[in-house]
Amino acid sequence: MKMKYILPMMMLAAMPLAADAQNKSGLVMSNLDKTAKPADDFYQFATGGWQKNNPLPAAYSRYGSFEQLAENSNKRINSILDELKKKTYKAGTIEQKLSDFYKLALDIDRRNKEGIAPVKPLLDEIAAAKTKADLQNLQVKYAMQGLGVGFGTGFGADEKNVTMNIYNVMQGGLTLGAKDYYLNNDAATVAIREAFKTYVAKMFQLYGFSAADAAKKAQKVFLHETSLATISKSRTELRDPQANYNKMSLKQFKENYPNIPLEALANGEGIKSEYIQEMIVGQPAFMAGYDKITAAEDAETLKALMEWSVIGSSSAYLTDEIREANFDFFGKTMSGRKEDHPLWKRATSQVDAQMGEALGRIYCKKFFPESSKKMMETLVKNLQVSLGQRIDAQEWMSAETKAAAHNKLDKFYVKIGYPNQWTDYSKLTIDPSKSFYENVMACRQFRNNKEIAEKAGKPVNRDEWYMTPQTVNAYYNPTTNEICFPAGILQYPFFDAKADAAFNYGAIGVVIGHEMTHGFDDQGRQYDASGNLKDWWTAADAEGFNKRADMYADFFSNIKVLPDLNANGRFTLGENLADHGGLMVSFNAFKNATAKKPLKNKDGFTADQRFFLAYAGVWGQNITEKEIRNRVKNDPHALGKWRVDGALPHIDAWYEAFGVKQGDKMFIPKNERLELW
């Protein structure tokens, strides 16, 4: 099912305190590298000590403050599960479901003995199909699994009528995610492509196919996915909400794409035809190309694609040998990790992925005090006031557009900590007599049925959460005009209750400002106060915005992240605008909060310096070269170093705080500095 279009921060938040309630700087001196000059490389100055003292763990391709907090959250979740598995519970209770599912996730000995038995009946059924029509019937029978289907579907808010859900159809079918992996010809990408072919063949062998058959099937999968890549939009092109909104009727879909059995697949999934009479086709050109591809492919190709779907959806839940082969490619080859996480971590993450809200409810009771929620609400209000002031400060904007922007800001729907409505898991059955894989599929079926029941032909539920409470992240969703800060991010080290306002506004404050700014970035600005994809800008103001936004895209595209690789400033534009806006809004809020009682110097730094050091400290990390290449293709966020060294040179207050002057490496002349929000 389709996930809502949301804009996560990949950054963390915590609760605020009054400006004069703390007295520590919040800084850890050993995290700094005072041999570096802040005006030449602020990232190294602010995080160099941390990088040196925290070498990259073997199980990670990137490790920083964000991952440290995720580790802490994972340990808390694991403590809940370890406590649950010590007891026996009445069948059907949420405790029984969590406990038994966790035990299944931990029981690798059982999975090794079972081998591929849990998926063998499905593979045999596919193998027995004699014709393309037989295979297509199986696609309908197992429609929820999307066997060999190269596009995605699901319900979400109609972006031009956001009170109602609508059926969505969008491009898909690429194991590697980004089309660049199939089409780019630089040495690093070519090496990954060759490794991918070997990996696919190996996986087919591990699922019982002969070496010769595995090689043939792998080639069919690779050629098919390459053909899909050639007709797919790029990650950057997918960021244009207007271009990816194309409403059509089911009748029109059938006329346009006669070889795609969409209605039969939807019916097989449990969706009645009445709920797909109108839909949004995100990428019509892709669907047209896919229609031709699927018409031309023979039965053996479709069979290989369906088998590959089974392999891909089950590889994390079967034997150690299969898991290790999967890790060797995605972990080592793609990202540069040296080893996988231990069993307890993998098991904890798997339970969290399938029954996250059930765990989240327990998590919040144990680890999230109500006082934190109230304090966070206060800080969010402070940041809203500040963003309003920043809107008024944009001299290039007309009064008319500013008024509309204020209206949108005033209507932000703020979610903090945990949802008002918890998921009811009573219809989910976890059966310990069945395999781990079968129980995972039961969880997927439960979620699928729940989404259809709650969204097909139904109004949008604004109280739905798109992250679990224990998630270490935050997001903005334009169709509900909401900002969300789950309980998982409201903890140290991104907030220090004993530190003063400079530290906390520099860390948590920027996080909040970042999410708010997403409502006014290059994508978010296209949605109105109600969340509809509707233009509320004057033509002149829209031109002024785009002119400024283009300068950000160009600036970041000129950054070399590796000697042979530039950043993609157009792909990361929304996040770069949100980082800059978050800094501007939070710094302004910080100055508001301390206007009557300025903070003293602490640990050798002024209050303004501590604000920027706190922000930079959030992004201290170590990362492999392979992961850098991977993220440039797949991650709409700039790399940690450039969320610091790319953002700060455009903020006048940073120059003033650290005495940055002409001749310093990070200096940009004032008339060339970028400003938006």
What are these regions (language model features)?
Residues M1-Q22:
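Bacterial Sec-dependent N-terminal signal peptides
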Residues A70, N256-N259, I280-P284, H341, ...:
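Intrinsically disordered, low-complexity linker/terminal regions across diverse proteins
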Residues Q22-S30:
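Short, Gly/Pro- and small/polar-rich lid/capping loops
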Residues L84-T378, N382:
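Noncatalytic, helix-rich "gating/capping" subdomain that lines the substrate-entry/channel surface
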Residues K37-D40, F45-R110:
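Active-site-surrounding "flap" and adjacent substrate/cofactor-binding loops of secreted or lumenal enzymes
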Residues M29, N53-P57, T153-G156, A178-D180, ...:
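Short, solvent-exposed loop/turn and secondary-structure capping segments
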Residues N31-K52, Y182, D186-Q205, A399, ...:
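Hydrophobic/aromatic-rich, well-ordered segments within soluble, folded domains that form packed cores
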